């Protein structure tokens, strides 16, 4: 009660409104004269064009080319966009909150122009903004240039930019409070803009960088002692020459490297606890970097059977690994998974998403799950949950599920999906084969879907 008594009636109402989605806070203006302008004092603003339409209209407008959009959809989306733009244009400059704690903008129609984005961000920065989030994705692909005052905003803690944003970092700038920086598929003013930005964020803790074709970045060094979380991604056609990552305080690392050749140097991550790796090349080198993690998500996108054989060996052991989420776009997955199980003696949770199957073409790289040479230690002592999303009709996957049930002494629950699109009778037969197989753990619950 003491905290509440410190507020006036209006201040308390504004505080309550700040916990509502902004569009609902605006609607309270019709309640009474007292409420009419209260929303104008809410310090957290969000203008999301998606929220104005049903999913059907957004999908019909955004997916096709502009000339293919039917007149009804175009009219509805365009009129709604104009109303929102007019509303922001009229009310944002007059917003009476002395500090704009956060401004979130998300637009995708040609109604909104790059100049609008620049002006509205400039207003927020002038009000000591702490959080800015801008997602601008018009069909005409015009980039919005951010205002210069953004790069000297001392109050800014969080900056999230997506899609058609031009990040042109000046040679002299200061963002002393910036802790969270997300840059997803944006364009940079020159090849050094991103490097300048990262090299001068001394308290940064959370960084997301997604590079894409035509973004002007060729090389990048991520050397940030304060960084705790890093998500770094490159598209398949990214014209990229190389990167270096040196982050001694990092606890979470996500890497998506779909480039044609691996050209990265990753080092110095002694405190890493969780890793999410999606890659096409150099799997062993990447796995050597994450042997200390407790949680690992591994997504291998490579159809070459021989590319997997270089991974196996006794020199990699995941002594702390408790949770493994394994996705693979390669039919030759069985030996790799068997090796991962052997290399993870403390594994408690296994999720396996089988993307390919090669039943009928078994070769030397296959593991016949009904007769492996030895049982991985984790199955005998620690594995508690198992989830398998199977490739439709995969006998290899069914044999894996049966093997896990037969050998895992501490298993508590097994969640099994045989695969979509399978003949109902064939699916039922596979389910019965798994359901009536022997269980090393008599209390294990099996869930089929």
UniProtKB/Swiss-Prot annotation:
| S-S bridge residues | none
Q: Which SUPFAM superfamilies match?
A: F-box domain, RNI-like
Keyword presence, Repeat? yes
What keywords are annotated for this sequence in UniProt? Leucine-rich repeat, Repeat
Which windows of the sequence hold LRR repeats? 27-52, 81-107, 158-185, 186-211, 252-279, 328-354
| Domain of life where this protein originates | Eukaryota
F-box domain boundaries: 2-50
Q: What is this protein called?
A: Putative F-box/FBD/LRR-repeat protein At5g62970
| Native source organism of the sequence | Arabidopsis thaliana
């Amino acid at each position: 009660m003491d905290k509440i008594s410190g507020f006036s009636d209006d201040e308390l109402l504004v505080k309550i409104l700040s916990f509502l989605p902004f569009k609902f806070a605006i609607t309270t203006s019709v309640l009474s004269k007292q409420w009419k302008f209260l929303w104008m004092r809410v310090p957290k603003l969000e203008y999301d064009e998606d929220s104005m339409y049903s999913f059907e209209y957004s999908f019909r407008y955004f997916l096709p080319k502009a000339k293919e959009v039917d007149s009804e959809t175009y009219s509805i989306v365009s009129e709604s966009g104009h109303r929102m733009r007019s509303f922001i244009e009229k009310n944002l400059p007059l917003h009476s909150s002395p500090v704009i704690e956060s401004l979130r903008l998300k637009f995708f129609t040609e109604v909104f122009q790059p100049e609008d984005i620049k002006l509205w961000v400039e207003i927020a920065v002038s009000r000591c903004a702490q959080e800015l989030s801008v997602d601008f994705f018009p069909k005409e692909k015009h980039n919005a240039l951010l205002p210069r005052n953004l790069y000297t905003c001392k109050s800014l803690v969080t900056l999230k930019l997506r899609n058609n944003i031009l990040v042109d970092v000046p040679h002299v700038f200061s963002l002393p409070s910036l802790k969270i920086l997300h840059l997803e598929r944006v364009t940079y003013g020159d090849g050094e803009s991103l490097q300048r930005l990262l090299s001068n964020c001394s308290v940064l803790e959370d960084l997301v960088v997604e590079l894409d074709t035509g973004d002007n970045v060729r090389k990048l060094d991520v050397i940030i002692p304060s960084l705790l979380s890093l998500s770094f991604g490159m598209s398949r056609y990214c014209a990229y020459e190389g990167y270096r990552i040196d982050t001694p305080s990092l606890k979470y690392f996500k890497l998506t490297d779909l480039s044609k050749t691996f050209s990265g140097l990753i080092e110095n991550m002694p405190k890493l606890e969780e890793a999410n790796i999606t890659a096409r090349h150099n799997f062993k080198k990447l796995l050597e970097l994450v042997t200390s993690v407790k949680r690992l998500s591994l997504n291998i996108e490579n159809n070459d059977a021989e590319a997997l054989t270089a991974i196996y060996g006794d020199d990699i052991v995941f002594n702390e690994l408790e949770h493994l989420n394994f996705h693979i776009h390669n039919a030759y997955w069985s030996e790799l998974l068997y090796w991962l199980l052997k290399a993870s003696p403390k594994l408690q949770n296994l999720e396996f998403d089988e993307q390919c199957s090669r039943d009928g073409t078994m070769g030397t790289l296959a593991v016949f799950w009904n007769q492996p040479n030895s049982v991985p230690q984790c199955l005998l002592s620690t594995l508690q949950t198992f989830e398998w999303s199977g490739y439709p009709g995969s006998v290899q996957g069914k044999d894996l599920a049966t093997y896990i049930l037969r050998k895992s002494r501490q298993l508590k629950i097994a969640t099994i999906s045989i695969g979509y699109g399978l003949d109902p009778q064939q699916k039922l037969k596979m389910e019965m084969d798994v359901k009536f197989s022997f269980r090393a753990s008599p209390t294990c619950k099996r869930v089929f879907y």
